[in-house]
Curated annotation (Swiss-Prot):
Record's subunit section: Homodimer.
Active site per UniProt: D246
One annotated GO biological process: 'de novo' pyrimidine nucleobase biosynthetic process
Entry binding sites for Zn(2+) 2: K98, H135, H173
Residues binding Zn(2+) 1: H13, H15, K98, D246
Location of N6-carboxylysine modifications: K98
Annotated catalysed reactions: (S)-dihydroorotate + H2O = N-carbamoyl-L-aspartate + H(+)
CDD domains the UniProt entry points to: DHOase
Cofactor note: Binds 2 Zn(2+) ions per subunit.
GO MF term set: dihydroorotase activity; zinc ion binding
Organism of provenance: Shewanella halifaxensis (strain HAW-EB4)
Record-given protein name: Dihydroorotase
EC top class, as a word: hydrolase
Length: 345
């Protein structure tokens, strides 16, 4: 197959950041994706309806002329979140609330430290039809970074899912066989997103031959057996798994430093890279479900009606992109060849 046409996809997990960065990130995503779930981990985090409304306006103002791209907004759960916050956020158009364990990722220090205390909030979310998005890692310093996702499932996620059968839960950016198996065996109210980097790479691509800071993300890349499990699960075409890039921009100097930031900025190449993975797996017929159908179906939103066409044509991801402030950013897969290209995009 040398050409494939899909219903226009959505990105069910990304980071736009704020300020000048929006002039880069919003057009990059709006190029191909009709909607995106926007993460709330700004400084300060987006925790209530007023902050969401203001952030959404800043995103809309950064859309290219004529764009109909729609940001789908989220709020950041803290131990101070109340049922009224959920009600107000829902009224403001928020579709989901994000659970970050404190310290798990960029700008998550304000996040949840006592998970059980949030059970009344989860109850309110189920009642009011708001999804729970989960960064599924424990953060205790004595737990090995490669084991934190599996430990989170065992310690917390299994309990949340069992306690709230009416709550839709998205286990975001899963990285392990443990997570894939958990989602596959869970009830229909549980789904997961998978990033391009966790399908394309494993921890050798981060650490062999030198540290590769632009492949560093959280949750961290795992061993190849976990990568293969993720690839196998998308090849099944299961509706429990859908596209979420976790595209997460950081300026070049913040990645290439003594304490480099976590995140892969994949917006300019994500759909093409997913196509490459599905092609390699002999499962191109499953790409549209993953990219365009399973996400809106799970969220209870209409599928898009426009289409995007990809052709089998080689191109090279740019080595860097200059941000509006003049500083460079290195995109994911920089300088690498990609086998699929969007037609007329």
């Amino acid at each position: 197959m040398t050409q494939i046409t899909l219903l226009t996809p959505d990105d069910w997990h990304l980071h736009f950041r704020d300020g000048d960065m929006l002039q880069e990130t919003v057009p990059a995503t709006a190029r191909l994706f009709q909607r995106a779930i926007v993460m709330p981990n700004l400084l300060p985090p987006v925790t209530d309806a007023k902050m969401v409304t203001e952030y959404r306006e800043r995103i809309l103002a950064a859309r290219p002329a004529g764009s109909t791209f729609e940001p789908l907004m989220t709020i950041f759960l803290t131990n101070n979140t109340t049922e009224q916050d959920i009600i107000d956020a829902k009224a403001a158009g928020v579709v989901a609330a994000k659970l970050y364990p404190a310290g798990a990722t960029t700008n998550s220090d304000a996040a949840v430290k006592a998970l059980d205390a949030l059970f009344p909030v989860f109850e309110a979310m189920a009642k009011h039809g708001m999804l729970l998005l989960v960064h599924g890692e424990v953060t205790e310093s004595h737990i090995d970074i490669f084991d934190r996702e599996a430990m989170f499932i065992e310690r917390y996620l299994a309990r949340i899912v069992a306690a709230f059968p009416a709550l839709k839960v998205v286990f975001e950016h899963i990285t392990t066989k443990d997570a894939a198996d958990f989602v596959m065996s869970a009830p229909d109210n549980v789904a997961a997103t998978i990033t391009p980097q966790h399908l394309l790479l494993n921890r050798n691509d981060l650490l062999v031959g030198g540290v590769r800071p632009h492949n560093f993300c959280l949750p961290v890349l795992k061993r190849s057996t976990h990568q293969e499990a993720l690839r196998a699960v998308i090849a099944t075409g299961s509706s429990k798994f859908f596209l979420g890039t976790d595209s997460a921009p950081h300026e070049k100097h913040r990645k290439e430093s003594a304490c480099g930031c976590a995140g892969c900025y994949s917006a300019w190449s994500a759909l093409e890279l997913y196509a490459q993975v599905f092609d390699d797996l002999g499962a191109l017929d499953k790409l549209e479900g993953f990219a365009s159908l399973h996400g809106p179906d799970f969220y209870g939103l209409p599928r898009n009606t426009s289409t995007v066409t990809l052709v089998k044509e080689k191109w090279t991801v740019p080595s860097e992109i200059i941000l509006p402030n003049g500083n460079p950013i290195v995109p994911f897969f920089a300088g690498e060849e990609v086998n699929w290209k969007v037609k007329n995009a």
